[in-house]
């Protein structure tokens, strides 16, 4: 049970401290108060970003606005987590040489005064109240006043007392001392020989063994100077820059990821429709990759921007390699479908047939289907002097038809777009899907039905030839946010332009004539290298239609998610208050094993209808069109609660949907904020402010996945439900940054991008190196979707060279090499693919036997660390730490079926151990564990 009682207030002490603060503010230089200048599987979210050899200077203005400066934890790096105060005004200049400078006393006072002001935010603003405002403020800042090692240190209880006054305007000295002592007891004492870190700016992390020092230069963890002592110890090894190929190109490693998806389809141990589903995923992944990543490469090449990337390759070289590898893989996919999966489906009674294989009765019935269902929605478009070559929409399936006029003898070209409103695979009449077994289902591609009725569309013309083709267009959005008076309107305008992006790929059937192929290449203004030739049918992503049919015996066995016991006890027939459950115990959710609908969705729903709830704040990156989350926020606003939604309308391929329900939220009275200029808001956060008998209490959810009920059934994600005051204060601060002006911020339990996440991780990696060199327990275990950030990768290389064991679980893009002599012998990388898309992010550090574990939304990519608002939360409750430690241990143990990265950069699938015993499927293990928890 988390203590939340209201606390008495030492009024006289508060008055004296307020007077002291006012005196400092009155004499301070006004400039000290100025802000710094500045105004999966299909989840891969293919955001085009700068070449990996460039820095994030293009978004410096946005980062200056988000003046968080979270370079570490509010507590010690050893025992705490969080983010720091921003650098001084000359930080930007000094950062060029890897240094920042502590602010002046007046600036520090201004910062603290700003914190005091923020601490008095109203209940509706979610800053807290009687209990959570005063009590939590005292506790929070008492901890901040304690030294980094967990002892009273330089500031002690008195400092904690003063700081708590600044934050909340009231405190009790004894309570501050007690809380500081409590925190000291939770953090391990610094051992002899502990590494002395680098002093931070006011309000930021101080590493073990460091006392506060005034006006000292701080070394940026991203700089080489920060790692100088480690590099000196590794002088006998070749310098890192002697390994020019230590970074794998991000585009090429993505191709490797999609190859692993294809290998899932090759697995004959899987149900046949599941194999077809993986073929579908492979195709849809490649579509998005070309729409964004390849389109971006082509655009840079056309503009002459082809610098050498971190991988040592330039854009032209990368594009050539992508093209050759993608064509090989699509050829392998087509062969797998034609020679393996398609026959296996037929054997299971699910046949994909063609027109020539039908009997006359079946043809007659399909002709009637064509006349009444298909013909009315077709629009043939001819090309002649009065009809220019038509616009071909991206990812549409089309028929290219060559016609001859029997009177003139002239040939003509026409195009027919197959409508998206009709099924791609038509069930043959008489052989439809029924409950009868064995199955006798026959499906015919829609293009076959249309092709054999072209005489209905072109009466009086001779049909010379017809071929199916498909184009992929550039789907990047280009919105100048700094110049856009209304971001929503600018996005809507750009979405209208996106459909006319340049063609980047043409897919054709292998039966196409050279003439038609060349004609399309010229009209689409592409090259022959952009043409992909495959046997029919094209666009195997539509196999998902067949997978979605009600044929359970040929798919993964259905799993029903469970409700965590803490939320809905077995003894109760009625759903209990989720707030009561959270007060008793922090709840760690693991979706889809734990049901999203009865946990996160229920949390928001109860908040919307609970009369004691005053305010709800939530970030929304992706959600479904009929989202119960959105409906709950609307209902809350209509019931008079203050509701704030931070909506990211730039979420890749969900822009239109997000705009629609953002307007719906606004109409209902929800305060809709579109994030920060230049930054995508990618963190997954919810904050609920509730009036309780002992005052206000704030309830939080921090997750790794989107608030999307549908994808939550297929994505593996983690989430934390808590009313911990440190987390609540951090979320309050972050929401205030996102919705208003709160540039001076510090965090206790969060690491927040773009300011502090990378540096917070770098500091922890260095701490593990130092601990290992001092003979203490040290290891690093990280699970992410992608890793390409060069500074993080180099830090992990340094850890490996120092002897620290590094285990990585990377589902997708992986720019690191492992097992390379002198570079990465101690780095081990696995990749897990299965029925659920592995989407959670876990960062775990040994911390000298006191594991420090974070979960959150951020991957180790430039966009996540530099151009997005991301948040990781430190898990502190011992049983939850133990559970996460067990999970990442399992996934890195070698006991499960997974892909392993080899020193030559290839991936090897391992399904059996050295004795030939079949390895466990980690997702099956977790499904069994979830069921066991609620029995």
Residue map of PLM features:
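N-terminal localization/anchoring segments of enzymes in phospholipid and broader phosphate metabolism
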Residues: 2-4, 10-13, 31, 93-97, ...
